[in-house]
Amino acid sequence: MQITEKYLPFGNWQTYCRIVGEATDRAPLLLLHGGPGSSHNYFEVLDQVAEKSGRQVIMYDQLGCGNSSIPDDQAETAYTAQTWVKELENVREQLGLDQIHLLGQSWGGMLALIYLCDYQPKGVKSLILSSTLASAKLWSQELHRLIKYLPKGEQAAIKEAETTGNYDSPAYQAANAHFMDQHAINVTPDLPEPVLRKKKGGNLAYLTGWGPNEYTPIGNLHGYEYTDRLKDLDLPALITSGTDDLCTPLVAKSMYDHLPNARWELFAGCGHMPFVQENAKYQELLSDWLISQD
């Protein structure tokens, strides 16, 4: 399968882009990774969707991580939703992506919703919301509910970190790691190489945009709230999430209930990455969805 790598100019920066497959008459699938700052790496497990669905699959590293520019010295102005939307617009313009299907995973889904609701772009044929959210407040509430299932000592370590603002203690680090093992993905050596691959940068983008962890959104996205605006998005939308996901069933259902033209697929036993944990099933679902929406 043909893999094309490009560096796209974006103002004084550049955006690394990875294109799977050759152009066809079907709209490409454009992937928006999570974080902020997680990089495209894990999306490489979806390369086969290009062949299965007969289209290009395009992924890129957002500003602040991976092979793209990492302007950490300009974090407060560079690592914002506005900049990341401009970068998305630039990727579409530079690659001539007039018609696309758009998939956003975690933060990438937030970026997709901001883009669609605030900028009303043309040419987005369908939306795939993968383990994402429409409300930072609900997300935080749900994750604090899940924290109550941790051992008492771990709950206390997390509470102390949030109270003091000190997230460096070994007790907190261990508690947060346990929480993420349960609800993001348990990192084991048998995971696919792209998922295990060490990403470049991204930590400051995450801290600036979101916060010190998943459940304490104190970055510049802390006020993110799009639930009531979903009713205005009439494009076909596919929501995917796991039963053990950071995107809890309530978070996913809140999006499903407000989107007028949505389907929701819940993956049993999966955390934040059903596309990794149930890769074959996810690829089949995604490929069938894309073909049905062409």
Swiss-Prot record:
Indicate the segments forming the AB hydrolase-1 domain, all copies. Answer: 28-278
A Gene Ontology CC term for this entry? membrane
Protein's GO biological process: proteolysis
- Endoplasmic reticulum as a keyword? no
Q: Which Enzyme Commission numbers does its entry carry?
A: 3.4.11.5
Reading the lineage from the top rank, the first entry is Bacteria
| Role summary | Releases the N-terminal proline from various substrates. Cleaves Pro-betaNA (L-prolyl-beta-naphthylamide) effectively.
Write the protein's name. Answer: Proline iminopeptidase
**Organism listed in the record:** Lactobacillus delbrueckii subsp. lactis
